[in-house]
């Protein structure tokens, strides 16, 4: 089974005070144990780093700590899926043809990575936006607190 994690899951898995920490952390630990193929979109790495280093926590998560989390928990075990320039062009064309704009376009990068990796599950706490972008595969989109890992 291939499972793609989005930023919302990775952030929750790193922040013990996050409301969904337990479910996200369980999925991350199972991924690191090799229970399934762990997949992330390349842009998710940068987005997770950006979010972690700007969360209003005390003490703040320092850039070196955010990098260490990604290095140890994600880069060491996950397959990173990167979009090509042609993928970006096709995605922009599709978004323009459907009149889709604004911040949701960043979620479309995640959906495209999920398609390219042929994942079985796209794990997110952002269900509605992703189901809107990938209606043909809405059943693949799930939240860590709604699905038990293998």
Question: Where are each of the predicted segments found?
Answer:
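Short, well-structured N-terminal submotif of metal-dependent ribonuclease cores
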Residues: 1-40, 55-68, 132, 145-150
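Acidic, PIN/NYN-like endoribonuclease modules and their adjacent C-terminal/linker elements
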Residues: 2, 111-150
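Alpha-helix/helix-capping structural signal
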Residues: 8-9, 43, 109, 128
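Alpha-helix C-capping/helix-to-loop hinge sites
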Residues: 13, 31-34, 51, 55, ...
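Active-site-proximal, substrate-binding regions of enzyme catalytic domains
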Residues: 25, 49-79, 87-89
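Short beta-strand segments at enzyme active-site cores
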Residues: 39-42, 124
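Active-site neighborhoods of divalent-metal-dependent phosphate/nucleic-acid chemistry enzymes
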Residues: 79-127
